[in-house]
A protein has these predicted regions:
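Conserved donor-binding/catalytic core segment of Leloir-type glycosyltransferases
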Residues: 6-10, 161, 199, 207-226, ...
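Short His-centered aromatic/hydrophobic patch
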Residues: 101-107, 131
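A short, active-site helix/loop in glycosyltransferases that binds the activated sugar's phosphate group
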Residues: 148, 155-189
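Nucleotide-sugar-dependent
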Residues: 276-286, 302, 307-308
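Conserved acidic donor-binding segment of nucleotide-sugar-dependent glycosyltransferases
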Residues: 312-322, 331-332
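A charged, aromatic-enriched C-terminal amphipathic alpha-helix characteristic of glycosyltransferases
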Residues: 332-370, 395-400
Length: 463
């Protein structure tokens, strides 16, 4: 179990309603953030979220930090308000051991913002690729390529997480023509871990009047990348069936509904089945797992990433229009359909924990200067980072050695209260005697506390 770490999550929000409210419950990128939090319950998580949200704030080990993300999908990959971002954090009281960056293009900006505060020298970096930039993933040829920024981030990170072991191959498709650099796929693969994810359980159900029979659900975004063009081509001739698109931006003839989670489950359970037409670029898919979770058949266009989700032996793949029509017409006789898929979350959790453990277990060359002075303060009841630094290193902003001291403290077993947004150290009883021996020669005169120890009555009073 990973204990005592503080992790900054820079998210990749893609789902907003018409009022600008972040729809976290429908945002597949944000679901990955929540999964990593659940995998690391003994860590404190600082989550940078859109200003307008209604994410439940009920966990002591999670602090939400509001930031003005752009609502535009493309702009979010390039827009960064460095002044606002760095002013969100007060490193007199806070520490980040890891940054989990869900927009790789932004990692350099994050590091520069922290460097302006002389912070981040030994902060480890994980990248999460929810999309890979290539011509197949861009909505238009007019969109400037971003793959060089993604490659830059890979150079700056410790580990890069792709949904599957084949997803990084999309980066290589940018190098068909000669350019200023080459594509070193082996370098990327050496840093790669995978984060396959399971769909969230659809718990509540809310009946409503569907008003149609023989419903086929298209539960993907209404976009070229999800195969809508092929879908519209293949459904030609299926006049006895009603296609129901769950994206409210879909044309009216496909209903384009805006259902809540309970209604969405009811629709799936009372349909003939759902379908996936992802036919080119893809790295993962949650929507096909939703239908399978309620024991309904899901017709899946045969694509390599989809095989990673449901397995190579899945019986409802199709390629041609004729194959699709045959499977659709068989749905009426199929009824309930059971197909077990791997526990993807279990694999994801293992890869996250293993990657963190590998970094934290690297041997240390020497004990940082002043580390024993910090231990001496903690042993004498001075627990907050700001208060310790005032005793040992008054010029905190001019000295970055305390970042390395923190890593050392965690390595030898000092506790950090991860239910507090502020760094708060204590010495466990099982190592107290050892710590007393380590500091027996410390010559540090503890000054009276001139600043009241940091306390808080709510989690967010520091920004």
């Amino acid at each position: 179990m990973i204990n005592g770490l503080r992790i900054l999550h820079y998210v990749s929000p893609v789902r907003f309603d018409k009022t600008g409210l972040f729809q976290h419950e429908f945002d597949s990128n944000y679901k990955v953030v929540e999964k990593t939090i659940s995998f690391l319950p003994r860590c404190h998580h600082y989550v940078v979220v859109p200003k307008k949200h209604n994410i439940p704030d009920t966990r002591d080990n999670v602090t939400f930090i509001n930031y003005p993300y752009s609502r535009d999908l493309l702009a979010n990959r390039s827009y960064f308000d460095g002044v606002t971002f760095r002013n969100l954090f007060d490193f007199r009281y806070m520490d980040f051991d890891f940054v989990f960056c869900h927009q790789p293009e932004m990692l350099y900006n994050i590091l520069v913002s922290f460097n302006d505060k002389r912070y981040g020298q030994n902060m480890n970096r994980f990248l999460f690729f929810h999309w890979v930039d290539c011509s197949q993933s861009r909505a238009s040829s007019a969109i400037p390529p971003a793959y060089m920024r993604q490659l830059e981030a890979i150079n700056l990170c410790d580990n890069v997480f792709f949904h599957t072991d084949i997803a990084s191959e999309w980066l290589g498709k940018n190098f068909k023509n000669e350019q200023s650099t080459t594509f070193n796929h082996d370098y990327i693969k050496d840093k790669t871990q995978t984060f396959p994810i399971s769909a969230d359980e659809l718990q509540d159900i809310e009946p409503f009047d569907i008003e149609h029979e023989n419903v086929l659900v298209f539960n993907h975004r209404w976009a070229k990348s999800t195969g809508v063009n092929r879908m519209m081509e293949y459904i030609d001739g299926l006049d006895d069936f009603k296609i129901w698109a769950t994206d409210y931006q879909a044309p009216k003839e496909y209903i384009g509904s805006n259902l809540n989670r309970g209604q969405y489950r009811y629709l799936l359970e009372n349909s003939l089945g759902s379908m996936s037409f992802v036919d080119s670029y893809a790295t993962w898919n949650l929507s096909i797992q939703d239908g399978l979770s309620v024991k309904k058949p899901v017709l899946v266009y045969d694509q390599p990433a989809m095989r990673k989700v449901v397995g190579d032996d899945y019986p409802l793949f199709f390629k041609t229009k004729d194959e699709f029509h045959t499977q659709v017409k068989n749905l009426k006789q199929m009824g309930n359909f059971t197909w077990d898929i791997p526990n993807h979350d279990e694999k994801f959790a293992y890869n996250i924990i293993k990657s963190i453990s590998n970094i934290m277990s690297k041997p240390r060359k020497h004990i940082p200067k002043d580390a024993n002075n910090w231990l001496y303060c903690i042993l004498n009841g001075i627990k907050y980072k700001h208060d310790i630094a005032k005793q040992v290193q008054p010029n905190l902003q001019l000295n970055s050695v305390w970042q390395y001291i923190r890593r050392y403290l965690l390595e030898i077993g000092i506790n950090d209260n991860t239910n507090s947004p502020f760094v708060s150290y204590s010495i466990p009883n099982n190592i107290r005697e050892d710590v007393e021996k380590m500091v027996k020669d410390v010559d540090l005169e503890l000054r009276p506390m001139t600043i009241k120890q940091k306390t808080f009555t709510k989690k967010h009073d520091w920004f």
